[in-house]
């Protein structure tokens, strides 16, 4: 990628990457190129001078989104979906059919919510919770994408190549077509959706005593946001009317999550409670501010639920000898541990662990000491 600038009476291309050699553009006359036009070149021959052709004109460099477009092209991000994928998508139903409902546990009678950020557009997990004499029954519902995306289909192969959705300041480049990610595979409110559900029995001490994992059917009652759930948990009257239908569920979920969190801390779980930076753009797509997004307990509730569901699934896969990649954390670098000890010493904080054999619990206690 690069930009054309007019120098005297000639348009000169300035590449974003310095190739240390002149560039010849074979098809410049085929495009309407003006001063400050951003474009993408394909290299035809690696020689001196470099032989290229224009493959895309992105627009003027100051126009909204052109800088992001250039970055995506520069990093070979797959943006568009080909015709084979579009044809497969057209064949997919955008509503749950009777055939889809077969062989699924029906959880549509459960009060169910999604909780995500204000700007979320696709919802891939939902929560239900009940209370009984032993404690809680927690349901984590995950969108059953595999029901719609079949192995070795064009959509599946494209998702494999993309690996993940890419979240940018002004857009999302999805792993799946929007008809799936924002449509039939998104757990939108007031519609039936196919899911995989991890149903977990949790005692009053926050211990998961049993679980089951089943194909399921849900019907989300409400799309909640972290900001408003946090407001509800803080007894803000401005959200009571909007969340009246799911208030009991959210308060029950809060109690359950706190017991899960306490159990995690007993095991030595480390809570770094880091803040995420969010770039604020103006109407022209230019960055004007960077704000820190703080995590309230609503975010922590969902985190606790998802971690527990992941642990249950990992245990299930392990107990059934199914191949799986487990996400684990390596032991910390001893040099960094000694650096940490040096900083703690400067702060006059007491170190009560052996740097050569540090445990997660040790880091947790140190963080607790210095959190103020």
For the regions a protein language model found, what residue spans apply to each?
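Append "with occasional cross-activation on large, charged helical scaffolds in nucleic-acid assemblies
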Residues: 201, 213, 226-372
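Covalent nucleotidyltransferase
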Residues: 130-132, 172-234, 242, 252
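A short, compositionally biased
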Residues: 6-10, 194-196, 273-276
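Charge-lined substrate channels and their catalytic hotspots, especially those that engage the 3′ end
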Residues: 1-142, 146-191, 230-231
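A short, sequence-level motif marking secondary-structure junctions
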Residues: 27-31, 56-60, 214-220, 294-297, ...
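Structured core elements
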Residues: 40-42, 53, 112-114, 126-128, ...
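Short glycine-/polar-rich loops that comprise or flank the Walker A/P-loop
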Residues: 162-163, 194-196, 321
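Short acidic-glycine loop/turn motifs at beta-strand connectors
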Residues: 7-8, 47, 131-133, 202-207, ...
């Amino acid at each position: 990628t690069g930009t054309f600038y007019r120098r005297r009476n000639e348009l000169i291309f300035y590449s974003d990457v310095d190739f240390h050699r002149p560039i010849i553009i074979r098809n410049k006359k085929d495009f309407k190129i003006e001063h400050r036009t951003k474009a993408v070149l394909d290299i035809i021959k690696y020689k001196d001078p470099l032989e290229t052709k224009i493959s895309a004109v992105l627009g003027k460099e100051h126009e909204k989104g052109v800088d992001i477009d250039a970055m995506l092209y520069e990093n070979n991000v797959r943006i568009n979906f080909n015709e084979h994928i579009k044809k497969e998508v057209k064949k997919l139903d955008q509503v749950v059919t009777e055939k889809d409902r077969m062989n699924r546990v029906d959880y549509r009678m459960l009060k169910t919510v999604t909780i995500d950020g204000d700007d979320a557009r696709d919802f891939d997990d939902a929560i239900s919770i009940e209370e009984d004499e032993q404690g809680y029954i927690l349901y984590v519902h995950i969108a059953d994408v595999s029901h719609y995306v079949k192995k070795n289909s064009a959509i599946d192969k494209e998702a494999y190549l993309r690996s993940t959705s890419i979240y940018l300041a002004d857009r999302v480049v999805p792993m799946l077509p929007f008809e799936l990610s924002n449509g039939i595979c998104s757990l939108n409110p007031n519609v039936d959706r196919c899911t995989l559900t991890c149903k977990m029995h949790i005692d009053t001490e926050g211990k998961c005593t049993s679980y089951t994992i089943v194909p399921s059917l849900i019907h989300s009652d409400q799309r909640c946001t972290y900001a408003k759930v946090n407001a509800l948990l803080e007894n803000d009257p401005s959200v009571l009317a909007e969340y009246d239908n799911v208030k009991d569920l959210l308060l029950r979920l809060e109690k359950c999550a706190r017991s899960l969190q306490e159990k995690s801390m007993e095991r030595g779980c480390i809570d770094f409670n880091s803040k995420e930076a969010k770039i604020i753009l103006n109407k022209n797509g230019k960055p004007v501010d960077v704000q820190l997004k703080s995590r309230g307990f609503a975010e922590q509730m969902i985190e606790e639920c998802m971690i527990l569901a992941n642990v249950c699934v990992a245990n299930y896969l392990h107990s059934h000898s199914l191949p799986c990649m487990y996400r684990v954390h390596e032991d910390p670098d001893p040099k960094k541990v000694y650096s940490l000890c040096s900083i703690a010493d400067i702060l006059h904080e007491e170190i009560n662990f052996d740097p050569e054999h540090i445990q997660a619990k040790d880091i947790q206690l140190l963080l607790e000491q210095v959190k103020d």
